[in-house]
């Protein structure tokens, strides 16, 4: 009896082991079926065919949603790679682009640094340009306004092209173009100021291609918090490049003894960067990081895309808020170094410059502050947003709103402190810029969340057009115009040169407060607009495939 019981137990144990082995084989077959390359040929035990029971895709926010069922596919088709089976199936992951993603993001960020370095090199030698060409504040402000006007007109065109053609080729051609124009502008004779104005307009066209398309490539390389981090690095290039523009302009002018040489640095670096983009940046598929690969193309007309964007309330309000940021940064970036120089003339700590080369100290200090506050602001904004996302789904626009409203207070204090203390003015600039710069990367991330991949380049272009049209396209000229208008009604003196420019710049904090209100309005609609974008992505995805072997 004991032997029978032992044999029975052994047989039962063998049967249980065989059953366990059978279950393990089935699980392995199911897991192979869920994988990218094995889904079409996955087999269960005994050669039974395995068919896909469901399909899932990753959404814009990183969550996983079930895609709609569709007609069967055939072996080897792209749709087969998305098939998942059973409760033990692995979640799909975006196809890897390898280590080149980080290098590509770094090169794109470097290009953004050069764009803004070139843009603000002119501001770094603005006083020399005024003395060389004999223009007043209004004429000096025209340089930046013409640049921005051409920039905003070209941006929608490049947005359309960026959603439909090879993006890295467009980027490189844009860099090569503005580099050539900037280098040529350094040889313009003294009597042809209008040629310098025209050249800045042409540079704006070249730089529009970059600012419109580059963020969408980064958006297609990364997702979720990684995308926020990479966009933070990319948009840190704005204050970094702006600060380096002031520093480069003033330093090269001092070293060469001629401000024209300041315009010959960025073109050389631009040619190198454009070549690196052609060689090292991958030709990324639109929607790649959103688990869509080849599945998304620009299927809708440009007019339909525009209508959809205008109806997107989060996009509209965040674009208006971005316009307020552009207004303030454009005006302050253009005029603050000159304003602080005039403040020191009034305080008898500096002399009025009557012929170039003029002093470079204020541009150097302001450039260094802009670089550091840009880094601090972008890091602080990204970190605050990641922490607040754990508390609320509306974290992105709320962090932007707090930064804007806080910045307005310290921008106001700049003009109070500058009357008696330059150090106090620099402290207010430091805090105000840090808070103002905290929203750049977050605003770009808001756009990525609420706009589907096939419309992102168009969305960036339209947002760029709007922000420049309502922002820095007119703010430098407007500030110069108001300053000259006030000076015409007063006696010509260093005191009124200082006061008139300060009164004109007081317009900036009020616009910044308005921008904070627009970010609060964005928070009201952000959650629903993001959910709608995720739903549209799922509808655009190609139908899943299930194959019976």
Curated annotation (Swiss-Prot):
Disease: Deafness, autosomal recessive, 115: A form of non-syndromic deafness characterized by severe sensorineural hearing impairment in early childhood. Sensorineural deafness results from damage to the neural receptors of the inner ear, the nerve pathways to the brain, or the area of the brain that receives sound information.
Source domain of life: Eukaryota
Location of the protein in the cell: Cell membrane; Endosome membrane
Annotated TM spans: 141-161, 169-189, 202-222, 229-249, 261-281, 320-340, 364-384, 398-418, 422-442, 466-486, 507-527
Keywords: Cell membrane, Deafness, Disease variant, Endosome, Lipid transport, Membrane, Non-syndromic deafness, Transmembrane, Transmembrane helix, Transport
CDD domains: MFS_spinster_like
Cross-referenced InterPro entries: MFS (IPR011701), MFS_dom (IPR020846), MFS_spinster-like (IPR044770), MFS_trans_sf (IPR036259)
Compositional bias ranges of the Low complexity kind: 77-97
Topology term for the membrane: Multi-pass membrane protein
GO molecular function, one term: transmembrane transporter activity
GO biological process, one term: regulation of T cell migration
Pfam families documented for this protein: MFS_1 (PF07690)
Function field: Lipid transporter that specifically mediates export of sphingosine-1-phosphate (sphing-4-enine 1-phosphate, S1P) and sphinganine-1-phosphate in the lymph, thereby playing a role in lymphocyte trafficking. S1P is a bioactive signaling molecule that regulates many physiological processes important for the development and for the immune system. Regulates levels of S1P and the S1P gradient that exists between the high circulating concentrations of S1P and low tissue levels that control lymphocyte trafficking.
Region span, Disordered: 14-39, 61-97
Keyword Coiled coil (UniProt): no
SUPFAM superfamilies in UniProt: MFS general substrate transporter
GO CC annotations on file: endosome membrane; membrane; plasma membrane
Lineage: Eukaryota, Metazoa, Chordata, Craniata, Vertebrata
Name of this protein: Sphingosine-1-phosphate transporter SPNS2
Record keyword Lipoprotein present: no
């Amino acid at each position: 009896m004991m032997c029978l019981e032992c044999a029975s137990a052994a047989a039962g144990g063998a049967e249980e082991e065989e059953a366990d082995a059978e279950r393990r084989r089935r699980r392995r077959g199911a897991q192979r079926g869920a994988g990218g390359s094995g889904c079409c040929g996955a087999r269960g035990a005994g050669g039974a065919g395995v068919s896909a029971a469901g399909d899932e895709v990753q959404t814009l926010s990183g969550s996983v949603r079930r895609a709609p069922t569709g007609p069967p596919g055939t072996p080897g088709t792209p749709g087969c790679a998305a098939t998942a089976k059973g409760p033990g199936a692995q979640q799909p992951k975006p196809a890897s682009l390898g280590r080149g993603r980080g290098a590509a993001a770094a090169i794109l960020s470097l290009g953004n640094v050069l764009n803004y370095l070139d843009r603000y090199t002119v501001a770094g030698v603005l006083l020399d340009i005024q003395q060389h060409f004999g223009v007043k504040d209004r004429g000096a402000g025209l340089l930046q306004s013409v640049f921005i006007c051409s920039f905003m007109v070209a941006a929608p065109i490049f947005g359309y092209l960026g959603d439909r053609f090879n993006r890295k080729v467009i980027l490189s051609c844009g860099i090569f173009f503005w580099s050539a124009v900037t280098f040529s502008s350094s040889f313009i004779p003294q009597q042809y100021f209008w040629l310098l104005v025209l050249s800045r307009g042409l540079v704006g066209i070249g730089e529009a291609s970059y600012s419109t398309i580059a963020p969408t490539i980064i958006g297609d390389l990364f997702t979720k918090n990684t995308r926020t981090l990479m966009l933070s690095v990319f948009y840190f290039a704005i204050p970094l490049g702006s600060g380096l523009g002031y520093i480069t302009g003033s330093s090269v002018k001092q070293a060469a003894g001629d401000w024209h040489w300041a315009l010959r640095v960025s073109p050389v670096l631009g040619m190198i960067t454009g070549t690196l983009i052609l060689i090292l940046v991958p030709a990324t598929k639109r929607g790649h990081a959103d688990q869509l690969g080849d599945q998304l193309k620009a299927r809708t007309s440009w007019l339909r895309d525009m209508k959809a964007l205008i109806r997107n309330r989060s996009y509209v309000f965040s674009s208006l808020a971005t316009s307020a940021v552009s207004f303030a940064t454009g005006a302050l970036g253009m005029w603050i170094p000159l304003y602080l120089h005039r403040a020191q003339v009034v305080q008898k700590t500096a002399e009025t410059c009557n012929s170039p080369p003029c002093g470079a100290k204020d541009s150097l200090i302001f450039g260094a502050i802009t670089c550091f506050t840009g880094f601090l602001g972008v890091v602080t904004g990204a970190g605050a947003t990641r922490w607040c996302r754990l508390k609320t789904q509306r974290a992105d626009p709320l962090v932007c709103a707090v930064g804007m409203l806080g910045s307005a207070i310290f921008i106001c204090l700049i003009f109070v402190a500058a009357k008696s203390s330059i150090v106090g003015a620099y402290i207010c600039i430091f805090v105000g810029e840090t808070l103002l710069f905290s929203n750049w990367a977050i605003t770009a991330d808001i756009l990525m969340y609420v706009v589907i991949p096939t419309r992102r380049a168009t969305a960036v272009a339209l947002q760029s057009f709007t922000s420049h049209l309502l922002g820095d396209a007119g703010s430098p000229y407007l500030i110069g115009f108001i300053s000259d208008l006030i000076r015409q009604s007063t006696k010509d003196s260093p005191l009124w040169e200082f006061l008139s420019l300060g009164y004109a710049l007081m317009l900036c904090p009020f616009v910044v407060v308005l921008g904070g209100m627009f970010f609060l309005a964005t928070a009201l609609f952000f959650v629903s607009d993001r959910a709608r974008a995720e739903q549209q992505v799922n509808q655009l995805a190609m139908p899943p495939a299930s194959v019976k072997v």
